[in-house]
Protein backbone atom coordinates (compact mmCIF):
# COMPACT_ATOMS: atom_id res chain seq x y z
CA UNK A 1 0.00 0.00 0.00
CA UNK A 2 1.36 3.44 -0.93
CA UNK A 3 2.28 5.95 1.78
CA UNK A 4 -0.61 8.35 0.83
CA UNK A 5 -3.07 5.47 0.93
CA UNK A 6 -1.83 4.37 4.35
CA UNK A 7 -2.10 7.94 5.63
CA UNK A 8 -5.64 8.27 4.31
CA UNK A 9 -6.62 4.97 5.93
CA UNK A 10 -5.10 6.08 9.25
CA UNK A 11 -6.99 9.40 9.15
CA UNK A 12 -10.23 7.58 8.39
CA UNK A 13 -9.65 5.28 11.36
CA UNK A 14 -9.07 8.24 13.66
CA UNK A 15 -12.31 9.87 12.48
CA UNK A 16 -14.24 6.67 13.15
CA UNK A 17 -12.76 6.42 16.65
CA UNK A 18 -13.68 10.03 17.42
CA UNK A 19 -17.22 9.44 16.15
CA UNK A 20 -17.58 6.39 18.40
CA UNK A 21 -16.34 8.32 21.43
CA UNK A 22 -18.80 11.17 20.86
CA UNK A 23 -21.66 8.74 20.26
CA UNK A 24 -21.01 7.21 23.69
CA UNK A 25 -21.16 10.54 25.53
CA UNK A 26 -24.17 10.90 27.76
CA UNK A 27 -26.07 14.02 28.78
CA UNK A 28 -23.98 16.58 30.60
CA UNK A 29 -24.47 19.51 32.88
CA UNK A 30 -22.52 22.47 31.59
CA UNK A 31 -19.53 22.94 33.89
CA UNK A 32 -20.28 25.57 36.46
CA UNK A 33 -17.01 27.44 35.97
CA UNK A 34 -16.95 27.54 32.15
CA UNK A 35 -19.22 29.20 29.64
CA UNK A 36 -19.57 27.65 26.17
CA UNK A 37 -19.60 30.07 23.28
CA UNK A 38 -22.71 31.82 22.05
CA UNK A 39 -23.17 31.70 18.27
CA UNK A 40 -22.96 35.27 16.92
CA UNK A 41 -21.93 37.09 13.76
CA UNK A 42 -19.76 40.17 13.50
CA UNK A 43 -22.48 41.91 11.49
CA UNK A 44 -24.96 41.74 14.36
CA UNK A 45 -27.47 39.82 12.26
CA UNK A 46 -28.01 36.29 13.52
CA UNK A 47 -27.14 33.56 11.01
CA UNK A 48 -29.53 30.80 9.95
CA UNK A 49 -28.19 27.66 11.64
CA UNK A 50 -31.01 25.33 10.56
CA UNK A 51 -34.00 25.83 8.30
CA UNK A 52 -36.63 24.20 10.50
CA UNK A 53 -37.56 23.47 14.11
CA UNK A 54 -37.41 19.81 15.20
CA UNK A 55 -40.66 18.25 16.40
CA UNK A 56 -41.43 17.97 20.11
CA UNK A 57 -41.03 14.19 20.05
CA UNK A 58 -42.29 11.72 22.68
CA UNK A 59 -43.67 14.41 24.99
CA UNK A 60 -45.94 12.82 27.61
CA UNK A 61 -47.41 15.95 29.19
CA UNK A 62 -47.70 19.68 28.60
CA UNK A 63 -48.16 22.49 31.12
CA UNK A 64 -49.23 26.10 30.59
CA UNK A 65 -50.73 25.52 27.14
CA UNK A 66 -54.42 25.99 26.24
CA UNK A 67 -56.19 22.91 27.57
CA UNK A 68 -52.85 21.18 28.10
CA UNK A 69 -52.68 20.61 24.35
CA UNK A 70 -49.30 20.03 22.67
CA UNK A 71 -47.42 22.72 20.81
CA UNK A 72 -45.96 21.97 17.39
CA UNK A 73 -43.51 23.74 15.09
CA UNK A 74 -46.45 24.54 12.81
CA UNK A 75 -48.52 26.06 15.63
CA UNK A 76 -45.55 28.23 16.64
CA UNK A 77 -44.98 29.74 13.20
CA UNK A 78 -45.14 33.52 13.43
CA UNK A 79 -43.67 33.47 16.96
CA UNK A 80 -40.09 33.88 18.10
CA UNK A 81 -39.45 30.71 20.11
CA UNK A 82 -36.83 29.98 22.75
CA UNK A 83 -36.60 26.23 23.47
CA UNK A 84 -34.93 25.72 26.86
CA UNK A 85 -33.78 22.24 27.95
CA UNK A 86 -33.81 21.96 31.73
CA UNK A 87 -34.36 19.59 34.62
CA UNK A 88 -35.66 20.67 38.00
CA UNK A 89 -32.88 19.38 40.28
CA UNK A 90 -30.13 21.07 38.22
CA UNK A 91 -28.76 24.14 40.02
CA UNK A 92 -27.52 25.60 36.74
CA UNK A 93 -31.03 25.32 35.31
CA UNK A 94 -32.67 26.74 38.42
CA UNK A 95 -30.37 29.76 38.33
CA UNK A 96 -31.54 30.55 34.78
CA UNK A 97 -35.23 30.60 35.75
CA UNK A 98 -35.38 34.22 37.03
CA UNK A 99 -33.95 35.37 33.69
CA UNK A 100 -36.31 33.19 31.63
CA UNK A 101 -39.35 34.28 33.62
CA UNK A 102 -38.47 37.96 33.29
CA UNK A 103 -37.74 37.54 29.57
CA UNK A 104 -41.11 35.86 29.03
CA UNK A 105 -43.03 38.42 31.06
CA UNK A 106 -41.49 41.29 29.10
CA UNK A 107 -41.60 39.92 25.55
CA UNK A 108 -44.50 37.45 25.39
CA UNK A 109 -46.88 40.32 24.46
CA UNK A 110 -44.53 41.10 21.56
CA UNK A 111 -44.54 37.55 20.20
CA UNK A 112 -42.01 35.54 22.23
CA UNK A 113 -42.82 31.97 23.30
CA UNK A 114 -40.55 30.05 25.67
CA UNK A 115 -40.89 26.26 25.71
CA UNK A 116 -39.19 24.57 28.66
CA UNK A 117 -38.38 21.00 27.64
CA UNK A 118 -37.97 19.09 30.90
CA UNK A 119 -35.67 16.15 30.19
CA UNK A 120 -34.91 14.24 33.43
CA UNK A 121 -31.42 13.61 34.74
CA UNK A 122 -32.65 11.37 37.57
CA UNK A 123 -35.49 8.83 37.49
CA UNK A 124 -37.67 10.83 39.90
CA UNK A 125 -37.62 13.80 37.50
CA UNK A 126 -39.64 11.77 34.98
CA UNK A 127 -42.58 11.69 37.42
CA UNK A 128 -45.22 14.21 36.22
CA UNK A 129 -46.25 14.90 39.82
CA UNK A 130 -42.74 15.94 40.77
CA UNK A 131 -42.41 18.12 37.68
CA UNK A 132 -45.81 19.70 38.36
CA UNK A 133 -44.70 20.59 41.88
CA UNK A 134 -41.43 22.07 40.60
CA UNK A 135 -43.25 24.21 38.02
CA UNK A 136 -45.54 25.60 40.71
CA UNK A 137 -42.75 26.10 43.28
CA UNK A 138 -40.68 28.04 40.76
CA UNK A 139 -43.58 30.11 39.43
CA UNK A 140 -43.11 29.07 35.80
CA UNK A 141 -45.92 30.34 33.55
CA UNK A 142 -44.50 29.63 30.09
CA UNK A 143 -45.19 26.27 28.38
CA UNK A 144 -43.34 23.22 29.71
CA UNK A 145 -43.07 19.81 28.03
CA UNK A 146 -42.09 16.57 29.80
CA UNK A 147 -39.57 14.61 27.72
CA UNK A 148 -39.02 11.47 29.86
CA UNK A 149 -37.58 9.21 27.14
CA UNK A 150 -35.30 11.89 25.60
CA UNK A 151 -37.25 11.96 22.33
CA UNK A 152 -37.06 15.73 21.93
CA UNK A 153 -33.57 15.88 23.42
CA UNK A 154 -32.37 13.46 20.73
CA UNK A 155 -34.29 15.27 17.98
CA UNK A 156 -32.20 18.34 18.83
CA UNK A 157 -28.99 16.31 19.27
CA UNK A 158 -28.73 18.09 22.60
CA UNK A 159 -26.06 17.25 25.17
CA UNK A 160 -26.44 19.80 27.95
CA UNK A 161 -28.55 21.22 30.75
CA UNK A 162 -29.32 24.07 30.44
CA UNK A 163 -29.37 24.52 26.67
CA UNK A 164 -31.22 27.18 24.67
CA UNK A 165 -32.25 27.11 21.00
CA UNK A 166 -33.65 30.36 19.57
CA UNK A 167 -35.91 30.21 16.50
CA UNK A 168 -37.23 33.07 14.38
CA UNK A 169 -40.86 33.59 13.33
CA UNK A 170 -40.28 31.41 10.26
CA UNK A 171 -39.19 28.48 12.44
CA UNK A 172 -35.50 28.75 11.56
CA UNK A 173 -32.79 28.18 14.18
CA UNK A 174 -30.84 31.41 14.63
CA UNK A 175 -28.85 30.96 17.84
CA UNK A 176 -27.78 28.38 20.43
CA UNK A 177 -26.47 28.94 23.94
CA UNK A 178 -25.32 26.37 26.49
CA UNK A 179 -24.97 27.07 30.19
CA UNK A 180 -25.60 30.13 32.30
CA UNK A 181 -24.88 33.79 31.72
CA UNK A 182 -24.74 36.12 28.70
CA UNK A 183 -28.34 37.04 29.47
CA UNK A 184 -28.03 40.51 27.97
CA UNK A 185 -26.85 38.94 24.70
CA UNK A 186 -29.75 36.51 24.66
CA UNK A 187 -32.19 39.35 25.28
CA UNK A 188 -30.66 41.33 22.43
CA UNK A 189 -31.01 38.30 20.12
CA UNK A 190 -34.68 37.96 21.08
CA UNK A 191 -35.23 41.65 20.38
CA UNK A 192 -33.49 41.32 17.03
CA UNK A 193 -35.73 38.44 15.91
CA UNK A 194 -38.88 40.16 17.19
CA UNK A 195 -37.82 43.19 15.18
CA UNK A 196 -37.46 41.05 12.08
CA UNK A 197 -40.99 39.72 12.56
CA UNK A 198 -42.75 43.01 13.31
CA UNK A 199 -42.18 46.75 13.28
CA UNK A 200 -44.14 47.18 16.52
CA UNK A 201 -42.19 48.95 19.28
CA UNK A 202 -40.58 46.79 21.96
CA UNK A 203 -40.33 47.48 25.70
CA UNK A 204 -37.06 48.87 27.01
CA UNK A 205 -34.33 46.24 27.42
CA UNK A 206 -33.34 44.89 30.80
CA UNK A 207 -33.89 41.49 32.42
CA UNK A 208 -32.90 39.69 35.62
CA UNK A 209 -29.27 38.50 35.69
CA UNK A 210 -28.46 35.85 38.32
CA UNK A 211 -25.06 34.75 37.02
CA UNK A 212 -23.07 33.58 40.08
CA UNK A 213 -19.47 34.41 40.95
CA UNK A 214 -17.79 31.28 39.59
CA UNK A 215 -14.43 32.30 41.06
CA UNK A 216 -15.70 31.25 44.51
CA UNK A 217 -16.48 27.71 43.34
CA UNK A 218 -13.59 25.25 43.54
CA UNK A 219 -15.34 21.94 44.19
CA UNK A 220 -16.80 20.24 41.12
CA UNK A 221 -20.28 18.82 40.88
CA UNK A 222 -20.21 15.39 42.53
CA UNK A 223 -22.41 12.33 42.04
CA UNK A 224 -22.83 9.70 44.74
CA UNK A 225 -24.43 6.65 43.07
CA UNK A 226 -22.67 3.70 41.45
CA UNK A 227 -23.22 4.95 37.89
CA UNK A 228 -21.21 8.16 38.20
CA UNK A 229 -19.99 8.22 41.78
CA UNK A 230 -16.70 10.02 42.44
CA UNK A 231 -14.50 11.51 45.17
CA UNK A 232 -15.60 8.95 47.80
CA UNK A 233 -13.22 8.11 50.63
CA UNK A 234 -14.27 4.63 51.68
CA UNK A 235 -15.43 1.20 50.63
CA UNK A 236 -18.03 1.20 47.86
CA UNK A 237 -20.75 -1.35 48.55
CA UNK A 238 -22.35 -3.69 46.04
CA UNK A 239 -25.75 -2.73 44.66
CA UNK A 240 -28.73 -3.66 46.88
CA UNK A 241 -26.48 -4.60 49.82
CA UNK A 242 -25.98 -2.74 53.09
CA UNK A 243 -22.38 -1.87 53.93
CA UNK A 244 -20.85 -0.68 57.19
CA UNK A 245 -18.71 2.43 56.73
CA UNK A 246 -16.34 4.39 58.96
CA UNK A 247 -16.19 8.09 58.15
CA UNK A 248 -12.85 9.86 57.90
CA UNK A 249 -12.59 12.56 60.56
CA UNK A 250 -11.43 15.10 57.97
CA UNK A 251 -12.10 14.30 54.29
CA UNK A 252 -9.55 15.17 51.65
CA UNK A 253 -10.22 18.36 49.70
CA UNK A 254 -13.31 17.99 47.49
CA UNK A 255 -13.93 14.44 48.74
CA UNK A 256 -16.78 12.94 50.76
CA UNK A 257 -16.93 10.22 53.37
CA UNK A 258 -19.71 8.42 55.23
CA UNK A 259 -20.15 6.51 58.46
CA UNK A 260 -22.76 4.00 59.62
CA UNK A 261 -24.91 1.72 57.48
CA UNK A 262 -25.32 2.72 53.83
CA UNK A 263 -26.57 1.22 50.59
CA UNK A 264 -25.19 2.02 47.12
CA UNK A 265 -27.61 2.15 44.19
CA UNK A 266 -27.02 3.21 40.56
CA UNK A 267 -28.20 6.82 40.99
CA UNK A 268 -27.89 7.38 44.74
CA UNK A 269 -26.57 6.22 48.10
CA UNK A 270 -29.04 5.72 50.94
CA UNK A 271 -28.80 5.87 54.72
CA UNK A 272 -29.97 2.61 56.27
CA UNK A 273 -29.97 3.40 59.99
CA UNK A 274 -30.55 6.37 62.30
CA UNK A 275 -27.33 8.12 63.23
CA UNK A 276 -25.55 7.72 59.89
CA UNK A 277 -23.00 10.45 59.12
CA UNK A 278 -21.94 12.21 55.90
CA UNK A 279 -18.93 14.55 55.59
CA UNK A 280 -17.78 16.59 52.59
CA UNK A 281 -14.84 19.00 52.21
CA UNK A 282 -15.99 21.76 49.86
CA UNK A 283 -14.88 25.16 48.60
CA UNK A 284 -17.79 27.32 47.45
CA UNK A 285 -20.25 29.84 48.86
CA UNK A 286 -23.18 27.38 48.97
CA UNK A 287 -23.58 23.61 49.09
CA UNK A 288 -26.67 22.14 47.46
CA UNK A 289 -27.57 18.45 47.65
CA UNK A 290 -30.09 16.56 45.55
CA UNK A 291 -31.82 14.45 48.20
CA UNK A 292 -34.88 12.25 48.45
CA UNK A 293 -36.85 10.23 50.99
CA UNK A 294 -37.18 6.50 50.32
CA UNK A 295 -40.72 6.34 51.74
CA UNK A 296 -41.78 9.94 51.10
CA UNK A 297 -41.89 10.76 54.81
CA UNK A 298 -40.00 13.64 56.41
CA UNK A 299 -36.36 12.91 57.27
CA UNK A 300 -34.34 15.19 59.54
CA UNK A 301 -30.68 16.09 59.02
CA UNK A 302 -28.60 18.22 61.39
CA UNK A 303 -25.95 20.31 59.63
CA UNK A 304 -22.52 21.17 61.06
CA UNK A 305 -19.95 23.40 59.36
CA UNK A 306 -16.36 23.09 60.59
CA UNK A 307 -17.71 21.44 63.74
CA UNK A 308 -20.26 24.14 64.59
CA UNK A 309 -24.02 23.60 64.41
CA UNK A 310 -25.48 25.29 61.31
CA UNK A 311 -29.16 24.38 61.33
CA UNK A 312 -31.13 21.44 60.03
CA UNK A 313 -32.79 20.25 56.82
CA UNK A 314 -36.05 18.31 56.44
CA UNK A 315 -36.01 16.02 53.41
CA UNK A 316 -39.19 14.70 51.81
CA UNK A 317 -39.76 15.36 48.10
CA UNK A 318 -36.85 14.45 45.80
CA UNK A 319 -35.30 17.79 44.84
CA UNK A 320 -32.40 20.17 45.35
CA UNK A 321 -31.85 21.30 48.95
CA UNK A 322 -29.56 24.15 50.01
CA UNK A 323 -27.70 22.57 52.90
CA UNK A 324 -25.06 25.13 53.87
CA UNK A 325 -24.04 28.70 53.04
CA UNK A 326 -20.52 30.13 53.43
CA UNK A 327 -20.38 33.93 52.96
CA UNK A 328 -17.17 34.76 51.16
CA UNK A 329 -16.53 31.19 50.08
CA UNK A 330 -13.44 29.37 51.33
CA UNK A 331 -12.90 25.72 52.22
CA UNK A 332 -15.15 24.07 54.80
CA UNK A 333 -16.01 20.62 56.09
CA UNK A 334 -19.75 20.02 56.12
CA UNK A 335 -21.01 17.23 58.37
CA UNK A 336 -24.54 15.88 58.19
CA UNK A 337 -25.88 13.90 61.15
CA UNK A 338 -28.87 12.00 59.85
CA UNK A 339 -31.72 11.12 62.20
CA UNK A 340 -33.57 8.68 59.95
CA UNK A 341 -32.97 5.77 57.63
CA UNK A 342 -34.00 6.21 54.01
CA UNK A 343 -32.35 9.50 53.03
CA UNK A 344 -31.18 9.22 49.42
CA UNK A 345 -28.14 11.24 48.28
CA UNK A 346 -27.99 11.80 44.50
CA UNK A 347 -25.51 14.61 43.86
CA UNK A 348 -23.88 17.77 45.17
CA UNK A 349 -23.68 21.09 43.36
CA UNK A 350 -22.28 24.44 44.36
CA UNK A 351 -22.86 28.16 43.95
What are these regions (language model features)?
Residues 94-137, 146-153:
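Structural microenvironment flanking redox-active thiols in thiol-disulfide oxidoreductases
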Residues 136-141, 146-189, 325-327:
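Thiol/disulfide oxidoreductase modules built on the thioredoxin-like
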Residues 2-39, 43-62, 184-351:
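Non-globular targeting/processing and membrane-anchoring segments
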Residues 76-79, 109, 140-141, 158:
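Active-site acidic short loop of glycosyltransferases
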Residues 55-81, 104-107:
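A short beta-strand-turn-helix
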Residues 69-94, 100, 113-115:
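Short active-site neighborhood of thiol/selenol oxidoreductases, capturing the structured segment around
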Amino acid sequence: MSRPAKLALLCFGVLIAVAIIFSMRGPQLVLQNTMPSVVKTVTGKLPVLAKSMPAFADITRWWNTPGGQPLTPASLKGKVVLVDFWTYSCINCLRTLPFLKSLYAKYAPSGLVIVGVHTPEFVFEADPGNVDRAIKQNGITYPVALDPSYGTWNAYNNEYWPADYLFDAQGRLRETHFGEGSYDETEQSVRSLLGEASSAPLPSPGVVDTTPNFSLIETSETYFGLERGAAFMGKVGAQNEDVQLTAAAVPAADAWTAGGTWRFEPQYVETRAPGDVFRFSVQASKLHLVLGSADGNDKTIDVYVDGAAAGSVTVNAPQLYTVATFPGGGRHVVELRIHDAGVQFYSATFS
